[in-house]
Amino acid sequence: MSGVLKSDGLEIAHVEDDRGVQGEAAIIDVDDREEYFVKPLYTYYCTCGEMAMISDTLINRMPKRERDGARVITPDRTTAKTFAKPGETVYVKRSPAVGLEQQYRKMCKKCSIPLFYQHPSALNRTFILADALLSAQEVGGFSGNNEEQRAKKVIMKRNVKNQGKMGSVTVSTMEGEEEEEMEARETAESYTMNARIVHDALKRKGIGSGKFAVPQTPSSSSSSSAAAAGSETPSVKRKRGTLL
Amino acid sequence: MGKDSKKHKKERRRERSPSTSDSDEERLQKRLAEQRSLKKDEKRRQKEEMKKNESAEEKRARRMEKKMRKDAKRKDADAEDTLIPPELNYTNLNNPFNDTKLTQTFVWGKKLEREGKSGLTQDEITKQTSQRIRKNLHEAAEFKRIRDSRAAAKEDMEMMKRDADLRAGQISDTKEREFQMDQIKERTRIRIDQGRAKAIDLLSRYARFADENPHTAKIPDFELENPMEYLKASCKSVDDYEDLIEDIKTYREVDGWAKNETWWMDVTRIAEDEIQKKAAQNRGDVHASVQTEVQNMFKNKSIDELLKLEDQMDAKIRGNSGNKGYWQDLDDQLKVFIARKRLREHHGRVLRLQLAIIKEEQKKEIQQQESEELLPVAEVPPQVKIQKEEEEEEEEDEDDEKISKKVRRKIDVQTLDDPELDEPERERKWRALTGDQLDDVTRELYRIGCYSPTYISADDTMPGIEILDEQADVDNLTERRNRNRGTLPSSSAASSGAPQGASSKMMAIAREGMEADESIFGAEEQLAAQRHLWSDKYRPRKPTYLNRVQTGFDWNKYNQTHYDQDNPPPKIVQGYKFNIFYPDLLDMTVAPRFGLTSCEDPDFAIIRFKAGPPYEDIAFKVVNREWETLHKNGYKCQFQNGVFQLWFMFKKYRYRR
């Protein structure tokens, strides 16, 4: 989930325009690099596991209300979308000198616990109740798409080839990898594939020869769990120190 | 040659006679001449007699002897001009070239004619040849000397070059080491800038600042925290502490071993103590209750007193008096305590210095403001006195934590939200903030943004409306959230602790009919990372389960022969009973499914249960045998009330001979 570019950076020239000498097919290579900053989106969940908010700002970086520890979603500096159903209107008594606070509360769609509230005087601001939302890491479990990513720089490479009648444009955002590295990686992967194929073949032969062995009696649950655990390989002693 | 010499003698005699006029001398001369002629005649007579008497052989020998004597004379006369080396012993008569004129100078007649030198005599020719040969030999010797000296000079140059290379090699080793040290410093700076500093980076920055600015009025560009906080924040395991100890050694090599020696030794000792604590090693012979007493004894004492106590303990250990293990362990604890106390005091000193600097700056600012208002001169002295008294009172009462709060750097909130700042720079600044700083910044943002709502008086509301109490509302919300979090799935039913109402019902259904031969089966197989299209909307989680393994005896022929009821054979797995709970399944109308896949061990298989959102797949490793699929043989596969039950037994084979 990366942010969408505001300006259209992909000004692709018309590849059929021949910029070289007329009558001769000129081979032109144009290499262009553009760097932009990718801000990840953070997903927050209710305590029951329902997704509650997607935001481009971490919750601990939003303005914090002193009185009750709530956080403010301000449209001018934070872009966020909330998933909640309207709840009840509540009057909260603050200290006697201050008075009452009227809150329009919004509840979780599943468990109906209040998550957000707004005030009648400023409906464009949404407050997040303290400790109401959990980040992906706090909820636990594994999800490949919701790991909290750090904001990072992405280099977009644009390569335009113009060969007379034919032409091609290549746009790539691979992180710093060059073609040579890609080729080397493909070669290594093919070697890995071959090794796996050979291993499977040898294993098949081994299984075939195993037919003549005496079949073992099935073991009980304790031994099966012990077999499943397996023995741990003694780890090699690691070199100490991190500076040199 | 002999005749010529005789002629010379005669000529000399004739030259002398006209000059002498004395008669006596003439007489002597005559007598001598007569005697000489007589001797000659006698010799000639003797020779003639010998010639007559001698034989042919004697004659040949005499002639050879005479010739050899002549040759010897000639050789002696021409000894200087002889060109034949003396080792060869060649003569005119004895040489392999059969040349009777070997010792004579060769005369190139035609060349002399061509050059117009045919008039030269033999002696002149010999002389010139000798001179030319001598010159050539001299020139050859000169060339040899020059060649030898050049070779010697070249060898000297090579020797010098080799020495220079050796010296340069040693220098390159030193330069390599220096380069690595510089790179260590550079990498530390980069890690701190990028917000991923390690413990060694923060400690070295703190040490360098405290060392370089003891009295300089310079405010640090980072937050001055207690070094112990760096250790607690960065080091989580024994490996981290061990790495830190090695890094400290490396850094002391970079900065010089003498710099901050006591401080680094204290940090190292504390790290070693943390390693021992985490390794859960035995603390020696001291009982746990005595340790508390020992720690209390160490408190409320200054460092000097503690050092004296250490000397006393060392004396006791050396003197072998009392329990040696006890005193040894006590000494170790005392050393660690001294290290911690010394670090704390050092940090307090640094903070006090910073506070003094800040106060001086504030005084300067106040003086500048007061200098602008020169009119009320009479009021200045009493205010200054009052301020001084207040400051003195404050200094005495302040604690280290209060000092650290005052020294804490004020963060410019405007900088963080500056629109001109580009994204990476802003992100870097945000990431560099600590927890407390982040809290302060967000509160400041709230105040600047004027987000506070307007409050209503109690009189303005409608009479019958419900008013929530602030604290009661918070407590209610917290309780509901905790109840929500309490129902989150755990990896196995055994570790769930106190199950909730619905869970207890499910548990009862699962445990129904449990027999003595069954045991709870909880070995879950780890699956690869699962990705679902719905994982963005619902939190994927694993279902809870309560599985059972059916065991029993297999009375096959082998076991019947070797065992009986009193001595039973080992039990085998006869079946499984899987009870998996899906209370929050979105679509209850679709039942979960299961499938069998093979695994590395051919005796086992992996059974995988798949359901819909929000549950992930779960798998177990089971015995790979054929199942009974008839209900009367114990097979059960149903999904009811949120519980998926799969019960099966393995087939039994019986045969008759």
UniProtKB/Swiss-Prot annotation, chain B:
Residues 1-83, 369-406, 472-503 are annotated as: Disordered. Residues 389-401 have a biased composition (Acidic residues). Keywords: Coiled coil, Cytoplasm, Developmental protein, Nucleus. One of its GO terms (molecular function) is RNA binding. It comes from the Eukaryota. Its main location: nucleus. Residues 26-60 have a biased composition (Basic and acidic residues). Expressed in pharynx, intestine, vulva and spermatheca (at protein level). Residues 489-503 have a biased composition (Low complexity). One of its GO terms (cellular component) is spliceosomal complex. Residues 23-77, 352-403 form a coiled coil. It is found in: Nucleus; Cytoplasm. Residues 1-15, 61-72 have a biased composition (Basic residues). One of its GO terms (biological process) is positive regulation of cell migration. PANTHER family: POLYGLUTAMINE BINDING PROTEIN 1/MARVEL MEMBRANE-ASSOCIATING DOMAIN CONTAINING 3 (PTHR21737), SPLICING FACTOR CACTIN (PTHR21737:SF4). Belongs to the CACTIN family. Plays a role in pre-mRNA splicing by facilitating excision of a subset of introns. Plays a role during early embryonic development. Required for the distal tip cell migration at the end of larval development and for gonad morphogenesis. This is Splicing factor Cactin. It comes from Caenorhabditis elegans. The lineage of its organism: Eukaryota, Metazoa, Ecdysozoa, Nematoda, Chromadorea.
